[in-house]
Amino acid sequence: MQGAQTSEDNLGSQSQPGPCGYIYFYPLATYPLREVATLGTGYAGHRCLTVPLLCGITVEPGFSINVKALHRRPDPNCGLLRATSYHRDIYVFHNAHMVPPIFEGPGLEALCGETREVFGYDAYSALPRESSKPGDFFPEGLDPSAYLGAVAITEAFKERLYSGNLVAIPSLKQEVAVGQSASVRVPLYDKEVFPEGVPQLRQFYNSDLSRCMHEALYTGLAQALRVRRVGKLVELLEKQSLQDQAKVAKVAPLKEFPASTISHPDSGALMIVDSAACELAVSYAPAMLEASHETPASLNYDSWPLFADCEGPEARVAALHRYNASLAPHVSTQIFATNSVLYVSGVSKSTGQGKESLFNSFYMTHGLGTLQEGTWDPCRRPCFSGWGGPDVTGTNGPGNYAVEHLVYAASFSPNLLARYAYYLQFCQGQKSSLTPVPETGSYVAGAAASPMCSLCEGRAPAVCLNTLFFRLRDRFPPVMSTQRRDPYVISGASGSYNETDFLGNFLNFIDKEDDGQRPDDEPRYTYWQLNQNLLERLSRLGIDAEGKLEKEPHGPRDFVKMFKDVDAAVDAEVVQFMNSMAKNNITYKDLVKSCYHVMQYSCNPFAQPACPIFTQLFYRSLLTILQDISLPICMCYENDNPGLGQSPPEWLKGHYQTLCTNFRSLAIDKGVLTAKEAKVVHGEPTCDLPDLDAALQGRLYGRRLPVRMSKVLMLCPRNIKIKNRVVFTGENAALQNSFIKSTTRRENYIINGPYMKFLNTYHKTLFPDTKLSSLYLWHNFSRRRSVPVPSGASAEEYSDLALFVDGGSRAHEESNVIDVVPGNLVTYAKQRLNNAILKACGQTQFYISLIQGLVPRTQSVPARDYPHVLGTRAVESAAAYAEATSSLTATTVVCAATDCLSQVCKARPVVTLPVTINKYTGVNGNNQIFQAGNLGYFMGRGVDRNLLQAPGAGLRKQAGGSSMRKKFVFATPTLGLTVKRRTQAATTYEIENIRAGLEAIISQKQEEDCVFDVVCNLVDAMGEACASLTRDDAEYLLGRFSVLADSVLETLATIASSGIEWTAGAARDFLEGVWGGPGAAQDNFISVAEPVGTASQASAGLLLGGGGQGSGGRRKRRLATVLPGLEV
């Protein structure tokens, strides 16, 4: 755990005093209701909805998400401040029906209520008092019918809002500009701020708002903790927040356990560990969520690049619609994946005596089957009878996913269910080959239009939730009860530091101590710097970071030259990198075995996508991970203090305080969750605040109130780290077969080689006359050694092309251990670079593990299979449906796999990935428990088509197991959508590019006279300006190779005197005529024998120190042993 920061450099201390929240009033006449609807969770008939907190549409620009909330006055002359941050979403409660629904399907509220009952979760119980009337919280002069009302609430006091214990003070209204609307906000203070008390009628309470919080927020928390009494959980959270009871056990009496736990041989310990893990999550998760957070750039809605080219409100709504479509795969994955974090069902304990580590014997399990089973309370008394599931197959048993399971995933909230359904509308159906079904049109006009439909009664068949469920039914996961230790899928924003290149964190020199001072002339050459240098070299060749070319090849000669230039750039960088490693005595052969791909999951709620669904997923992910990392700690404590027949609440009464106190040092910063502890202070003993007692009576006075902090220490979460080992080092035979590289030469080495996708892209350019496909042409060449030559083309050029492709593919086949076929030149260059490094490290036997990104691509398709485009109109027949949809299109989304995730990770992506948290102890007698978050696998065949087992590339059938060495991550870049791309602080001058290009040419051609190429490049870049170059100009342009200045100037003078045109082609032809080409001068050379000793030479010059000489000799010998075996 990092030490506490000083008061002046943490966000909590820098925040300003303020209220516990605000009620915002937006004028309906100017407020962009359709944009709010596209961001919100409205459904047909909603009375309250949630919308993300965003500067420029729900709050004013410059809104501070961190505040020191004045929440109590122990006496009239002292105030207590508490540092907290705002909740990620706001709640629209007044005139909410004016916001259009995001999903138009009817009947969601009744469906959620019925499903909540069958799953045993309690419904919201309104307080025994009426909701506040608009006159109680509206400022004077505002017409309640002309404004939309919403609450922005802080994390620490959202339970006080839920229970109606905040007080609105309309006299303290402030006018703010929210977007283009002149809005008003009214502060909310805790009733404890008023020592003399506040009449209940003045306390702000809205039953629709509290019901929305109960369903959309707190039910999800209860599901993550596996408790069904949601209202009681909210009471306990409020009590913990007010009375600082984080170290007191609270939720254990609410826990319920399935039959698998009750019947377990070690059920007592299992129940105690499960309950203790939940208690720790309840104690620490709220503290982390309410901590001060950095304000991300994506919070500024009014500066989203998404709207840069939008003209008018319609274009803005369409842009938001496309942005939502790019987020749909993350949401659908959580629904379609069997191991979704939404389906985590409990804690299990392994009973076998396998090789599983003792610390991994307790683990989180998932399964919808477990979630609908009967449960018992901590005293082993039945409390929920269970639900058998709908009669879908006539067997009256679980096994088939039903609409009720989708409602469970949405936390029985009609708001969240509407948002989930909206995202699922973007998904394509995958029809099972085993169950032929009627067409969508027949279903919509038939069964969906029947009055028997429980949701729409046949009035809105096109947008009914049952119709959507019918269209996607083959993608939903099976309902089963599993006790396996599988990964669970989490979703959220990626952290800022990811190492996802082919070799991950190889040679990053982070967390490695320096034993001694390093000379200034020996800087560390990291793997990250190597990749940056490679990209710079490629940019000089006209290849951008995404692999796009400035100048496309126009024939076989250009095609071969393009690859030879890239090969030369890669080889030069490899040699320099290997030289640096050998020079610095780096044990790279050992380091490559322990390198990982590293991804970070951000713990900042405001970094998450602007969507209430992702707020729910973030809360669920954080709570599940906190429980997971606490399991071995609870297990060890229970082993030392066995329950001996005690129920979990009884055991926790005596041990929880010690367990909770030690958890911070035992679990944080131990490999998975990183956090910092900050000390929050208020710099002044007093602060200027309005006189709240007078303001309550409508009088406005200011006063200087003495204040102090009620809570000093704050735990600020940073990131969750997920790793993936790059080089296979295991002993498992099945896994080994998946990674081992076959030694037999494949017949179709060209098709699976590095050039195939480029040969296909430029097929019509290279072979304009042929009717053969590129796949067949090159497969045929690998067997018959013949290629077609277009009429009028040079046979020699095509022969050179074929020989280059053949030779390069054969060499690639021998050395390649990176199982991708590159799709652009950057991936090609990185594959060649990393293959060379791995060969130098001796890693040639096994393929390395890869992370591939699944990046969403939106597209417009005919609306025949997407009935929701028809809206709520009636459908009489299948023919009428076909006619109505024939002219319409629907926006859908598909995912494309990227070969290398590193470029996507630079764009601050939203990620969805499976994670397994392994626990282990340290080495050399260190008995501390550490954790490692490892990247896992998705379960469920309906998740995405890219995850289905493919037959392989080309014409061969690939043996099963290739997917074992490829891990997948769903990634949606946000750079350019919600975050502006960074512009260069300083513009690059043309002369800098010329200088860099000349130095690159000389560096790559040190073994030959490069003046010819330097002059031609200079003429190409500067033209006639070459004639007036001075010696100083030439020395600057040549940089560290300025000794060539005289030769270059002489050659330029020769060209100037000839009177030819100042173009690269003319200069090249002229110099070839004069010199016969580069290096054509024939000189006589004599052989000079190597001197036998150096003693006689040493006396004539400086005598070098023995230590330096020996060290240099050792490094040279080491380099000499590396480079001959390095094929580049």
From Swiss-Prot:
The keyword DNA-binding applies. InterPro entries: DBP_sf, Viral_ssDBP_head, Viral_ssDNA-bd. GO terms for cellular component: host cell nucleus; viral tegument. Residues 1104-1128 are annotated as: Required for nuclear localization. Gene3D superfamilies: Viral ssDNA binding protein, head domain. Keywords: DNA replication, DNA-binding, Host nucleus, Virion, Virion tegument. The keyword DNA-binding applies. GO terms for molecular function: single-stranded DNA binding. Its main location: virion. It is found in: Virion tegument; Host nucleus. GO terms for biological process: DNA replication. Belongs to the herpesviridae major DNA-binding protein family. Homooligomers. Forms double-helical filaments necessary for the formation of replication compartments within the host nucleus. Interacts with the origin-binding protein. Interacts with the helicase primase complex; this interaction stimulates primer synthesis activity of the helicase-primase complex. Interacts with the DNA polymerase. Interacts with the alkaline exonuclease; this interaction increases its nuclease processivity. Plays several crucial roles in viral infection. Participates in the opening of the viral DNA origin to initiate replication by interacting with the origin-binding protein. May disrupt loops, hairpins and other secondary structures present on ssDNA to reduce and eliminate pausing of viral DNA polymerase at specific sites during elongation. Promotes viral DNA recombination by performing strand-transfer, characterized by the ability to transfer a DNA strand from a linear duplex to a complementary single-stranded DNA circle. Can also catalyze the renaturation of complementary single strands. This is Major DNA-binding protein. It comes from Epstein-Barr virus (strain GD1) (HHV-4). The gene is DBP.
